Each structure stands twice: as structure tokens, then as C-alpha cells.
From Swiss-Prot, chain B:
Keywords: Acetylation, Golgi apparatus, Membrane, Phosphoprotein, Transmembrane, Transmembrane helix. It is a multi-pass membrane protein. This is Protein YIPF6. Predominantly interacts with YIPF1 or YIPF2, but may also form a ternary complex with YIPF1 and YIPF2. This interaction may stabilize YIPF1 and YIPF2. Residues 2-84, 137-146, 206-212 are cytoplasmic. GO terms for molecular function: identical protein binding. Residues 106-115, 168-184, 234-236 are lumenal. Belongs to the YIP1 family. The modification N-acetylalanine is found at A2. It comes from the Eukaryota.
Amino acid sequence: MASADELTFHEFEEATNLLAETPDAATTSRSDQLTPQGHVAVAVGSGGSYGAEDEVEEESDKAALLQEKQQQQQPGFWTFSYYQSFFDVDTSQVLDRIKGSLLPRPGHNFVRHHLRNRPDLYGPFWICATLAFVLAVTGNLTLVLAQRRDPSIHYSPQFHKVTVAGISIYCYAWLVPLALWGFLRWRKGVQERMGPYTFLETVCIYGYSLFVFIPMVVLWLIPVPWLQWIFGALALGLSAAGLVFTLWPVVREDTRLVATALLSVVVLLHALLAMGCKLYFFQSLPPENMAPPPQITSLPSNIALSPTLPQSMAPS
Amino acid sequence: MAEAEESPGDPGTASPRPLFAGLSDISISQDIPVEGEITIPMRSRIREFDSSTLNESVRNTIMRDLKAVGKKFMHVLYPRKSNTLLRDWDLWGPLILCVTLALMLQRDSADSEKDGGPQFAEVFVIVWFGAVTITLNSKLLGGNISFFQSLCVLGYCILPLTVAMLICRLVLLADPGPVNFMVRLFVVIVMFAWSIVASTAFLADSQPPNRRALAVYPVFLFYFVISWMILTFTPQ
């Protein structure tokens, strides 16, 4: 024990000596030129000083992370490196965040345990893009499969689904977090004890929570309506649970009415998104495609088409 | 003559440069490059004048550019670890490929807007906007590749998919059926894999190893969407 204390003490002394010896001007100019070097120096300094004062490891960890975050936001708004700080993630980090969004646990805060004060925009952006394209592709594939079962359905590629899916997914993943963030900021003004998430963190929570829908949409290719609904409910449950568990520590301090209303609105919007996807992209026979055949083809195909009508009603 | 007078001064100013830079004095370190830049543009202009393209015939100029584009096509079709595609980039090849692809994807009858494949403008926007997004993404992740180099590689690597589109149009002339679809599926999958392999061979080295997957995934998505557009194309 004593030897360990001595060791740390010596280390500090060395560090202070080093600091005293090196002129201040030189170090600051160097850190301006080379950001990584300055970054490392600050992290070591803050870790040491907080470790000496605070016994709790988590506190110092948090403080160091905060310091790190302040360091990161140094570059100006119009510089490229400012935006690079939003994409400062590794493959393992992104995979860890996706795993965290897939397996929500009560009391396991996504922001605290996975983002750790470093929200990224890579995940939200590419998860949204993937979801939009997967929605459009599988929406088309269901039509192809329906045509395979029932040759009377005329299939033609529906490219407009890409546009619709892209616009709706991106709007949901950016506008809802914006509204949520604004609301929480307003509530913070009312109730001072609340510490809301930043806008980027909110976007990150929503972006990663949409990941569950990608496998769900692929599984919706199975043309069994009750199975589709089960998969939909499962994915929605997982995603909404992740959102609620993450938002709960923030809204807990607020009044019970506001907290309940906010969480139910969040879950309701999420359910609306899933329902919208299901009803718009996965109708087994959209009405647009039923209209043209009677004009082109003769009467027999028109009769053959009528038995498919109940099928289209069944899942929706 | 002017260069002859200035060039002896050049080594004289060049030698104290590291000495002043060591002092990190702003006023001096700013002075030196100004003096250096006076001589350098003159020399480069003189050197350029020797190999000027002004005197050669138009045919030579066009043939040289076409040869460069053709050489890059060969590099895509037979991807090796070589940086010809990266060193002298051009956007002629991507433009040709993109326009060809969009023209072939255009359906004969533009009946209703809601019920049809992608229009010319949509293909054009997907290809260019997608390539720009992927490039920005790889730059933001910290890749050491220039913006247009990446655009050039992504554009040239559409070549296998354009070939797939050509084959699909030829196959579609035959009678439709499951065999027809299977042939098209096979062709598109092979060409899709080819595009991915070619583009990653050129682009993957620009990223640090722990971020390579993050940079390659958007490329995969990009070519996947283009392949899907090709596969679902039906002329009517």
C-alpha cells in the first residue's frame, strides 16, 4: 500500500516538474498544431488530478470524458474537422452500440453505457439509409412473391417506394428527436433538476433504435400475416423498450403526468412508424396495380383477379 | 534571365528556413515562403511550356484522354493493387457509365409515374448523390483519399454493373420465365461482387484498419441498390 502511494506521488511530482520545466507557450502552440498530442496531454492531466481528489472512479471517468468532449468541440462550425468529430467511431464501437440497442435492459442506459458522451452520426445516418432501401426492396419483393403465387397480379418495379421510404424514415429519425430535445429543454426550464440529453444524443438514441426494424422488414417477406404481426410486435417492443429505458432517467424527475404522457407519445409515434411501414409497403396487392389490368386485358383475367381481393384485405 | 538571377538567391533563403522555423517566430516564418513563391511559379510555367498540348492536333488530345479512360476501365475489370485509378483521376468515365446505365434503365413507355421503374433523373441522382455521400462519409471517418479520387473510383467501378445491365437487356429479348430470371439474377450477383471487390481494392487502404468496415459498408449499400434497379428492370 505504502509503496503504491509513493509510486503515485512520485509520478505526480515528475509530471509537475515536467510541466514546470517546459514553457507554457511552447506546449500551447504545439497543441494547436497537432490536435492528437494536445488531446493526450489533457486526458492524462485531468485523469491524474481528478483521481487524487475523488475517490469514486466513475466520477473521475465522467469528468475526464466531459473534458474530452470539450476538447473535441474546439474546431469551428465551418471547418471540416468539426464534422469529423461526429464520425469519430470505430467498427467495434458501432457494433457495440447496435448490440446495445438490440438488447435493452431495465436500468441499462443506452446513453451512459454505449454512447459515453461521444454520440456519432455514422450510425443514425447509415441505419436510416439501410432501412429506407431495405423497405423499398422488400416492398417490391413481396409483390414479386405475390405474383409467383398468383400470376394474375401484374408486377412492375415501383421505384417511388424508395423516395417515400427515404423521406419518411429520415423525417422520423430527425424531426422527432428535435421535438423531443426541444420539449426536454423546455421542461428543464420548468424543473431544474432534470439533465436532458443533447440533441446529438437524442438523434443517436433514435437512429440506433431503428436498427431492429431492418431484420424485421426482411422477415416480413414471409407471406404469413400472423407471423408478420408477431415479428412486428416483437421488433416494436424491443425498440420502444430501448427508448423508454433510455429516456426514463431524464423524465423521472418530472411530474408523473408529464413523464407518462411523454413516454406514451414516444411509444405511440414508434408504433405509428411500424404500422405505416407495414400497411404501405407490405400490402399483398396494392390498388394501383389492380386498376390497369382490366383496361388492357380481356374479361377472363378480370374474373381471375376477383378471388385475390379478400387476400389483400386480410393482412391490413 | 530573370530566373538565372533569382535562382542563386533560392538556396540562400532555403538554408536558414529550418533555423527560423525552430524559433517559431511568426513574423519571420511568414516572410520566407513569400520569397520562395516568387520563383516557383515562373519555373513551373516554363517547364509546362515545353510539353504544351497547344501545338498538337485535336485528334491526339482526344485519343490520349480516351486511352486514359480505357486504361482505367481495364483496371476496374482486372483489379490489382495499383494506384493508376487514384493518381490521375477523371470524371469522364463515370459520366459515360452513369449516362449509359440511366439510358438503359429508362423504360420504353413512361406510362404512369407511380407504377414504373426509375426514371433517367432518378438513376442519375442516385449514382452521383450516392457517390458523393460515400466519399464524404469516408472523408469524415478520417480516410486519406482526396474527394475526386474517391468519386472517380466509385464511378469507374459501376462498369461491371453497366455490363450486367447490357446482358440483362439482351437476356430480356428472349422469352420471359423463371430461367430467364435466374440467368439475370446470376449475372447481376456476379457483377455486383465484382464491383465491390474492385472498389474495395482501391478504397480500403485509405482507411485505418479499425474503420475499414465502416467505410466499406456504404459502398456495399450503394452497389446493392444499383444492382437491385438492374435486376428489377422490365422493358414495357
